Amino acid sequence: MNRFAILTFWLLACLPAWASEGGDEWWQEKTDTERALEVNPGELEFLAEPPEGPVHHHDNRITITEASLASGWIGLRQCHQHLDPVGRAQIVFGEGRIRALRVTASENIERAWVEGASVQLEGVRSDARLCIEAESRALHAQDDGYLLKNGPYMRRFLDGYFPMHVTMTVEAPEGLQLASVEPERQPGFRVWREDGRYHLDAWFEGRLVTRLRLERTP
């Protein structure tokens, strides 16, 4: 018996919605009590220790140029690893907030193609991997600098939220520095600068929204 499952991710003020059919035998084998204990209703909870076994990894590489500061459009390279096995799925972005969308790599996926503001998938097998490139209208000018707002990220199945791993690398023009970040740094949520880039690493359940405020150095 197939059910309809939703795994939703929201990136850079766009809406990548991961929707799938089938492949939920692992869920059906669990008892009602086990499911109730494991389900997160949506409240953000950072995981100080990564869970055992493969977890959906959502990696984002963002490039902000001088042109981005004027237009709000940034370069985006995004990869999904350890996707759940499903018959059909799609990643849907918000209309008008994504352009030049293309699939750059796929593994253990029978077919992957762009359709409008979405990426359609068929035959997603175990240990699947998908990479895309696009331009995203994600940067917002403010009086005191710029805001890069991402989220909410979530891995949703039926009525529950499950562990997810999100990483991000942000490359910005010289003279632009990170002024603040939300949520605050804590176990399970790290933000740091290395090799001239900003890096974010988050292990969590529920819904995650990140806000990176950037400002010009004097």
PLM regions: where:
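N-terminal, polar/Ser/Thr-rich
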Residues: S20-A67
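Solvent-exposed beta-hairpin/edge-strand motifs
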Residues: Q28, V39-G42, P85-V114, G160-G188
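Short beta-strand elements of extracellular/lumenal beta-sandwich folds
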Residues: S68-P85, N150
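Intrinsic-disorder/low-complexity, polar/charged segments enriched in Ser/Thr/Lys/Arg/Asp/Glu/Gln
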Residues: W73-R77, V86-R88, D127-C131, P163-T167, ...
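Surface-exposed, acidic/Ser/Thr-rich flexible loop segments
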Residues: A117-F189
